[in-house]
């Protein structure tokens, strides 16, 4: 799905809801499915949209910045957040933990900002479930799943990125 088509869908959703109701837009896909690219295009096209910075225990990739791309945590700090119930969702994928802080998402929604979340498939499912219990999230939620054009293209993307082991491909 191109960012232009997705942007059009989000625009329609924003117009059908209550005036000034912020949206929580979940973009999910398999690893290498284009989540980051689509999110970057959406953020460039919709200046009023902001992304929620998520937490991870994985190593920093080239060009990533603390607090802008992710909050990079050690395993002990991440576990403390899990135990405190601070995450809207969290999961371990290929040995690395990822999580979305409730305060990060709800704070931005309460400021009237549309929030974009780039999450894995597990994370999107968890957020959809939890949103049913939190009216503020349920009202704001728009969930989009991206599929790659083909499995061969997905494998090519993952190989080109060079961050996954051959066993994980």
Q: For each predicted feature, which ranges?
A:
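Extreme N-terminal, non-catalytic leader segments
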Residues: 1-24
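Hydrophobic/aromatic beta-strand patches that form the interior of the parallel beta-sheet core
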Residues: 25, 52, 71, 142-144
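Conserved glycine(s) of the Walker
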Residues: 29, 34
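N-terminal phosphate/diphosphate-binding loop that engages ATP/GTP or pyrophosphate donors
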Residues: 37-86
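ATP-dependent NMP and nucleoside kinases share a basic, alpha-helical "lid"
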Residues: 79-86, 100-161
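Small-molecule kinase domains that catalyze NTP-dependent phosphoryl transfer to phosphate-bearing small molecules
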Residues: 163-169
């Amino acid at each position: 799905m191109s960012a232009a088509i997705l942007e059009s869908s989000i625009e329609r959703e924003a117009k059908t809801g209550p005036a000034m109701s912020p949206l929580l837009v979940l973009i999910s896909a398999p690893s290498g499915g284009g989540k980051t690219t689509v999110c970057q295009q959406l953020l460039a096209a919709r200046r009023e949209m902001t992304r929620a910075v998520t937490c991870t225990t994985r190593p920093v990739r080239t060009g990533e910045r603390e607090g802008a791309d992710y909050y990079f945590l050690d395993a002990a700090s991440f576990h403390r957040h899990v135990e405190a119930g601070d995450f809207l969702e969290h999961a371990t994928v290929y040995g690395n933990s990822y999580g979305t802080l409730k305060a990060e998402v709800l704070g931005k929604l309460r400021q009237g900002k549309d929030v974009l979340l780039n999450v894995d498939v597990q994370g999107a499912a968890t957020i959809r479930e939890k949103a049913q219990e939190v009216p503020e999230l349920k009202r704001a939620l728009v969930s989009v799943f991206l599929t790659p054009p083909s499995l061969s293209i997905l494998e090519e993307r993952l190989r080109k990125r060079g961050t996954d082991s051959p066993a994980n491909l």
